[in-house]
Amino acid sequence: MTENVPRRLLPLLGVRGGRSRVTCRFRCGDACYHEAPNTSSNPYFGDIYTAVLSRRGMLQAGAVSIGISALAVSEADPALAGPGHAHGHHGGPHPHPHSRLDFTPVRPNTDDTVTVPRNYAHRVVVRWGDPVVPGAPEFDFANQSAEAQEKQFGYNCDYVSFFPIDSRRALLWVNHEYTNENLMFAGYTDGSTADLEQIKISMAAHGGSVVEIERVGTTGEWRLVTKGRRPYNRRITATTPMKLTGPAAGHPLLRTAADPSGTRVLGMLNNCGGGITPWGTVLTAEENFNQYFVGGEGAPEETKPALRRYGIATSGDTRRGNRRFDRVDERFDLSKHPNEANRFGYIVEIDPFHPHEQPRKRTMLGRFKHEAATIRLTKDRRVAVYMGDDERFDYIYKFVSDKKYRPGSRRHNDTLLDSGTLYVARFTGNSPADQIDGSGRLPDDGAFDGTGEWIPLCDAQRSYVDGFTVAEVLIHTRLAADAVGATKMDRPEDIEASTATGKV
């Protein structure tokens, strides 16, 4: 008979404070401790910025403001769902006139606890291991299994979105970005020595969850619905069947022994940020997918430049410190399946209200370390998606659909992200210095320092990058952006559009 162990807090094993090296190891595979994959000679935003400040004589003027203009888009119609926003005030107990909440901010501290402002409270809505689908077992730290984890709430939440059902019920979508096996399993060292069941549990703890929540009376509190049918609840993991859609689907670079069609893939990995579409689906972003692969040193030579550009090691001991998913699923060994890595690094679209519909990896939005996806409608109701590649010295992207959004037309809107134009940003700072005087008057060149341009990479039928087909642009997006002179950035993450002007 198995003894039930009481639910307890995660053992921290002495790891405390800030962004520790242990966190870096599990979250992004120590990305910042390796050479940046972008070895191009493209201009760096920091150099452009410094040159702008120098021209304006910052030290003499005392203040500088740089505006980066981009495609002006109108704010999306009130979406079926959306993340909430609150505005605090840093100067004391009196809120800014435009604040929605009145609170005194929490002072910086190193307390090992969740601290909220005075007169506020916090509650746990859902936690790792909580049952998600009907029939899922209660969490048992000492007796975990992959079968149970596939039905339970995953690990390390990131992006969260809220989808109302009615005035008292809603769905939450939650990304499960990565796993800390050293906290999940007693005595864990690394993937090479881990029990195979532990590796399967880790794979099941990745991905995302859809859970139903409900209001608690009139308290303002929400809680997890734990009884009844819960028809929308589901888990998405590293082994959930998904579709590859868009112009790159079916290309030879996406074909594998297990999927000769190049249109079916199992799972999503390291999902970080995301966004909500006007038609009520969630876009979830695959970020540091490179860390899950081994065997790059044995991959075909012609594939190695692209692997390295995506941060995948092609020399040395690629298995050291790795989670070693390849021990239970050999597709993660690139010496055996070199194209498998090309099937990760996409924006994944999921409809939380259709639990039997497969998630879709939208290749038209490019392949890189997606951090998030900010969706807006243009003035003519096409869909614009703004994206950042969260890697040192990588780029900012934009997608604009060919077709227009149709409210209420689910079938039509499901096609919007498969056809359009993908752009990458190039920033400049070349206005005449003596005409930048702080008055607000445009200089002779018609733009202030700090402007930029969107460079088209491809649309669904045509590549605008010499030497690249459309599919190659969408699969090797970083290399295509290198080729057109995109501006290197400092790990661009979230990108937002002004609700007042529509500019990003």
Predicted regions and their residues:
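Beta-propeller blade signature
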Residues: H206-E214, R343-P352, V400
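N-terminal secretory signal peptides
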Residues: M1-L53
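Blade-edge beta-strand/turn elements of extracellular beta-propeller
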Residues: D111-R127, G135-A148, T218-G262, I350-F368, ...
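Beta-propeller fold recognition
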Residues: L196-S202, H206, T219-R234, D394-A480, ...
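N-terminal export signals
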Residues: A51, G57-G84
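Beta-rich catalytic cores
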Residues: N156, N270-N271, R343, K369, ...
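Carboxylate/His-rich catalytic cores and anion/metal-binding grooves
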Residues: L196-T240, N271, G275-F332
